[in-house]
Amino acid sequence: MAAIGDYGAKAVWPAGFQIYQRGAAADGVFIVLEGHVVLRNKIKVGRGFVPVIATSGQTFGSEGLSSGARYATDANASEETTTLFLSGQQFRAFVRERAAQTIPLLSQIMSERAFLLEKLHELAALNVDQRLISTLSHLSSDRTFTTPDGRLKLENNHHRLLCEMVGATRESIALALSRLVSAGIAERKGMTFLIQPNSLANTLGDYTTGEVGIPVAREMTIT
C-alpha cells in the first residue's frame, strides 16, 4: 500500500459503526481496504435508500474533496471494516508530490460517479424487476454474497438491504424474486434464493434493448 498509504490514516471500524452522518461537514476521501461500508439516506422511520455499498478497493465520502462540502449520506460499516482516510490536505499533498500515482484514485472516483449516474437512470427508466436484476448483478461481483461455486446467495436478512438498494417495498421485492424463480433465473430453498450470475447478465442485456449494459464501478487495486 505504499504510495497512498504514506499519506493516509488507517482505521478499523466495528460492525454497525457510523463513520459519518448525512449533513456533517465533509473532508477528504475514504478508501475501503477490507469489509463493506453501506451508504444510506434515511427516508422515514425504518426505511432508507442505499445508492451503493463501498467494498474493498472502492472509495466513499469523496464529497470531502470539494470546498465547504457536506456528506450526502450516512456511512456505516456493515461488518468489521478497515479504511484508509486522506484528509483534503493529505489528498492535495499526494496529488502534488505523486502526480502520476494519483491517476488510479481519480479514475476510481470518476468510475463510481458514473455508476451513481447510471443508478439515477435506473430509478427513472426501469421498473422494479429490472432494477432488482441490475442490483443482483452488482451484488454478484461481491464474494460476500456468493457461494463457493459462484452463485449469488440471498438470505432472509438481505431483503431489507435489497429493498433499500432497489428503491421498492418488501412486498414488491418478494414478488419480483418469485417471478425470477418462475422464469428459471433463481432457485428457492426455504427462505434462501440462489441465482446464477450469468442468467442475470443475459436478462439484463435483454432489458437494455441494444444499449450498453449497466456498468459496475470497478475496484481500484492499492499497491
Enumerate the language-model features and the residues they cover.
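Cyclic-nucleotide recognition modules
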Residues: M1, V52-A114, E118
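Cyclic nucleotide-binding regulatory domains
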Residues: F17-E80
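Polybasic "coupling" helices that flank or enter modular domains
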Residues: S78, R96-G167
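Residues that scaffold the ATP/ADP-binding catalytic core of kinase and kinase-like folds
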Residues: R40, S62-E63, A93-F94, T135, ...
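Short aromatic/basic micro-patch
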Residues: V29, I53, F85, N156, ...
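Phosphate-/nucleic-acid-contacting segments
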Residues: L139-T223
